[in-house]
Swiss-Prot record:
Gene that specifies this protein: obg
GO biological process: ribosome biogenesis
Chief place where the protein resides: cytoplasm
Family: Belongs to the TRAFAC class OBG-HflX-like GTPase superfamily. OBG GTPase family.
Stated name of the protein: GTPase Obg
Positions with a binding annotation for GTP: 166-173, 191-195, 213-216, 283-286, 314-316
Cofactor(s) listed in the protein's UniProt record: Mg(2+)
Species annotation: Buchnera aphidicola subsp. Acyrthosiphon pisum (strain APS) (Acyrthosiphon pisum symbiotic bacterium)
Keywords from the named record: Cytoplasm, GTP-binding, Hydrolase, Magnesium, Metal-binding, Nucleotide-binding
Low complexity compositional bias, start-end: 68-77
Subcellular location field: Cytoplasm
PANTHER family tied to this protein: DEVELOPMENTALLY REGULATED GTP-BINDING PROTEIN-RELATED, MITOCHONDRIAL RIBOSOME-ASSOCIATED GTPASE 2
Length: 334
């Protein structure tokens, strides 16, 4: 299924039903008094998070949702039926924004969590409600109010504990696949990963974390080049970022050049994301001699003044993976 992480929908809640003007008319009761009933409330429109969904694709084809109007009141003090509500299912992690005002209405981050996005109109009052000691035959009633209508922007931001970032083809997908079993495409051409993928990493019983793999970032991404910058928002909820670095890059650049590219694009995108806890993960150590490896790591640590944790791994050969996952679990428990 195609991954869609944005949608704009137009929602119209139901109008409230009108109150009724009516008088009781029965044999032998010439002055039965007012018996006009109230109208029914208009139907509401809700969003509900569903953990069986992982895309907003359905909302790209159906953009307008209109709830049912409340029915009008009738005689014998009969109230109109309330309009039926509409419930729109969205993936967990959906951010809800008022499209016109840009106000963030809220986030849906738990299964079956509900959010009211358009409230139905109030019911109108029938004339029975206006009877008093001084007005025994009221002829007034009220109209039901208009239901809310608005445009809602939905943005899916995946919920993951850990996120991976780096240039294309640095081994992010291989790492995520090997530690979680997530089904992510792996090949030797750029942008193999076309959309974010989530994987669940189970270390031991009650010890697990969710990891997100997003498309690679290239130079100029913040100006629209490549794919990765669009999906960086999916890392905003992560508690830890893993910057995967290919020690034998296919673009014939020194690894430090690629590190600089990713960090520059990350900084341009969001300082908040740039300042998130980040570990450097040096991948493909199996393709270098010990001397070459030590020299490159020494140069990178000196150039970038790395004080954060860093790891030497081979995602293909699964070298250093167990230690990395164990340390991630410990970090997330802090």
């Amino acid at each position: 299924m195609k991954f869609i992480d944005q949608a704009i929908i137009h929602v119209i809640a139901g109008n409230g039903g009108n109150g009724c003007v009516s008088f009781r008319r029965e044999k032998y009761i010439p002055k039965g008094g007012p018996d006009g009933g109230n109208g029914g409330d208009g139907g509401n429109i809700w969003l509900e998070a569903n953990n069986n969904l992982n895309t907003l694709i359905d909302l790209r084809f159906k953009k307008k949702f209109q709830a049912q109007n409340g029915q009008n009141g009738s005689s014998r003090k009969s109230s109109g039926k309330k309009g039926d509500d509409i419930k729109i299912h969205v993936p967990i992690g959906t951010k809800v924004i008022n499209y016109q005002t840009r106000e963030i209405i809220g986030d849906l981050i738990q299964h079956k969590q509900k959010m009211l996005i358009a409230k139905g109109g109030w019911h109108g009052l029938g004339n029975a409600r206006f009877k008093s000691s001084t007005n025994r035959t009221p002829r007034q009633s009220t109209l039901g109010s208009i239901g809310e209508k608005r445009d809602i922007q939905l943005e899916l931001m995946l919920l993951a504990d850990v996120g991976t970032l780096g240039m294309p083809n640095v081994g992010k997908s291989t790492l995520v696949t090997n530690i979680s079993g997530a089904k992510t495409k792996i090949s030797d051409y750029p942008f193999t990963t076309l959309h974010p993928v989530l994987g669940s990493v189970n270390i031991q019983k009650n010890k697990k974390f969710i990891i997100a793999d997003i498309p690679g970032i290239i130079k100029g991404a913040s100006y629209g080049a490549g794919l990765g910058i669009r999906f960086l928002k999916h890392l905003e909820r992560c508690k830890l970022l893993l910057h995967i670095i290919d020690l034998v890059p296919q673009n014939n650049c020194h690894p430090s050049d690629n590190i600089k590219t990713v960090l520059n694009e990350l900084k341009k995108y969001s300082l908040k994301l740039y300042n998130k806890p980040r570990w450097f993960i040096f991948n493909k150590i199996d393709l270098l001699s010990v001397e070459e490896l030590n020299q490159i790591i020494k140069e990178i640590i000196f150039q970038f003044k790395i004080h954060e944790k860093y790891y030497l791994i081979s995602s293909m050969k699964k070298i250093g993976i167990k230690k990395l996952c164990s340390d991630i679990t410990k970090y997330l428990k802090k």
